[in-house]
Amino acid sequence: MQIKHLITLFFLVLIVADQCSAFFSLIPSLIGGLVSAIKGRKKREISTQIDQYRNLQKREAELEELLDRLPMY
């Protein structure tokens, strides 16, 4: 989810909580969930980028090895 969607969802829950007092107990856990979701997403993005970079390095090394094995004409 994009941050815009998370913020929209957060405000929607706040409006509902204003109308119904039962949702007040959910607000702290909602805020904690949003914060952990944003932090978790950043960690996943960074680890994905690192994995993609490693895969790219492996492919480049394999390609160079393959090109070295080809006969010169």
Curated annotation (Swiss-Prot):
Q: Which GO terms describe its biological process?
A: defense response to bacterium
Which keywords does this chain's UniProt record carry?
A: Antibiotic, Antimicrobial, Cleavage on pair of basic residues, Secreted, Signal
UniProt keyword Repeat, yes or no: no
Give the record's GO CC terms.
extracellular region
Tell me the compartments it is located in: Secreted
Q: Does the keyword Secreted apply?
A: yes
- Residues in the signal sequence: 1-22
As annotated in Swiss-Prot or TrEMBL, what is the tissue specificity of this protein? Expressed by the venom gland.
| Residue ranges annotated as propeptide in the record | 45-73
What family name appears in the similarity comment? Belongs to the non-disulfide-bridged peptide (NDBP) superfamily. Short antimicrobial peptide (group 4) family.
Name the job this protein performs: Antibacterial peptide.
- Fill in the misc note: The primary structure of the mature peptide is identical to that of TtAP-3 from Tityus trinitatis (AC P0DRB7) and ToAP4 from Tityus obscurus (AC A0A1E1WVR9).
State what protein this is by name: Antimicrobial peptide 6
Organism, per UniProt? Tityus costatus (Brazilian scorpion)
The top of its lineage is: Eukaryota, Metazoa, Ecdysozoa, Arthropoda, Chelicerata
